[in-house]
Structures are given as C-alpha cells and as structure tokens.
Amino acid sequence: MSLQTLSTPTAEPVEEPRPVEAPWQVSDRIGTALLRAPQLGDAAEIWRIAKDSRVLDTNSSYAYLLWCRDFPGTTVVAEVDGRAVGFVIGYLRPESPDTVFVWQVAVSPTERGRGTGTALIQKLLDRVAPHGVTALETTISPDNPASIAMFAAVARRRGAQLTKQPLFDAGVFPDEHAPEDLYRIAPIAQEIR
C-alpha cells in the first residue's frame, strides 16, 4: 500500500473574519483578583469551579483543557494568590461573528458577592469589542436568578439593552434539564463609568 499525495484545486482565498487575538497580556485587577487570559494550567481549577457551582453543566476536564488552549481570546480567568478563582468562557458564533456567546461563567464560593463574575464578563467584552463584536448572547435557565441579575448588571453598566426569548424547551434535552432562555446584550460598547 502506498501513500498518495492529494492535490487541492487552486481557488481564490476566502476572506474570513479575523479571530480574536489570543495571548493578550493586559491584565486588570478587581479587588484582589487579577483578570487575565487562561493558561493550560488553569483548566483543572476551572473544571472544579464549574463542578462546585452546582448550577452549571460540568463538561469533561478535557473540554476545559481545549478551551484554555483554543479559545484564550474569548476566555478570562480571575486569579487570586496564583490560583484561578473564577472564569468566563465563550466563543464567537460562526454564523454571527459579531456576537460572542458566553458558554459558562462561574466564581469560587470564596469570591462570590464581590462583583468578580460581572468583572469577568466586562473584561471579556472589552477584549472582543475592538474586533467588531457588538453583542453578547448567553443562555440561562429560569431557576438561576443570580445569573440573570449578573447579566442585567452588565447590560446596565454598558447602557445596553438586555432581551430575552425562549431558546431550548426542556423537552429537547435527552436528560432532565430546565429550559434555557436566550439573553442578548447589545450594543456592547465600552462600559459607562
């Protein structure tokens, strides 16, 4: 058996949306937390924070490793004393690259109530807005008022509109799961101080 070289036809290059540049070194502090891009070493702690939240669907530890490696431009980690204590992970929607979808946001119990979750989302939006992103989307189940309040606070601080519509009914999930509503914040211009 011999290997065959495959040739590809010559075609005009397709202009694709530019991905958000990954390793951004600009860090901010909120209280004692440093907000920064993720590192592979953060994945295990991010997985634990998600698992301990008891609200998020916990993905495999492998998924968080990939997230830290492949999506550093749309992920922000909160660090205190060298340890991850919170995170927001998201991605640019392929069908709508001007929209960042927030997949998960969580903060360890020791950091809750300090505005860390809101600061993580604000940092993410500040990071992606210069790249043409104008909207944020996320899904939240109706039984999670803390998340709803957090995203409402982000919208207020940005002077943006927060809209809600049903997205996934409980019946579409293969397991027992609450329905998920789609929340959208737009426009996500710079934070109003």
UniProtKB/Swiss-Prot annotation:
<dbReference type="Pfam" id="PF00583">
    <property type="entry name" value="Acetyltransf_1"/>
</dbReference>
<dbReference type="InterPro" id="IPR016181">
    <property type="entry name" value="Acyl_CoA_acyltransferase"/>
</dbReference>
<comment type="similarity">
    <text>Belongs to the acetyltransferase family. EctA subfamily.</text>
</comment>
<dbReference type="GO" id="GO:0033816">
    <property type="term" value="F:diaminobutyrate acetyltransferase activity"/>
</dbReference>
<comment type="pathway">
    <text>Amine and polyamine biosynthesis; ectoine biosynthesis; L-ectoine from L-aspartate 4-semialdehyde: step 2/3.</text>
</comment>
<keyword id="KW-0012">Acyltransferase</keyword>
<feature type="domain" description="N-acetyltransferase">
    <location>
        <begin position="33"/>
        <end position="185"/>
    </location>
</feature>
<dbReference type="InterPro" id="IPR000182">
    <property type="entry name" value="GNAT_dom"/>
</dbReference>
<feature type="region of interest" description="Disordered">
    <location>
        <begin position="1"/>
        <end position="22"/>
    </location>
</feature>
<keyword id="KW-0808">Transferase</keyword>
<protein>
    <recommendedName>
        <fullName>L-2,4-diaminobutyric acid acetyltransferase</fullName>
        <ecNumber>2.3.1.178</ecNumber>
    </recommendedName>
</protein>
<dbReference type="InterPro" id="IPR012772">
    <property type="entry name" value="Ectoine_EctA"/>
</dbReference>
<dbReference type="GO" id="GO:0019491">
    <property type="term" value="P:ectoine biosynthetic process"/>
</dbReference>
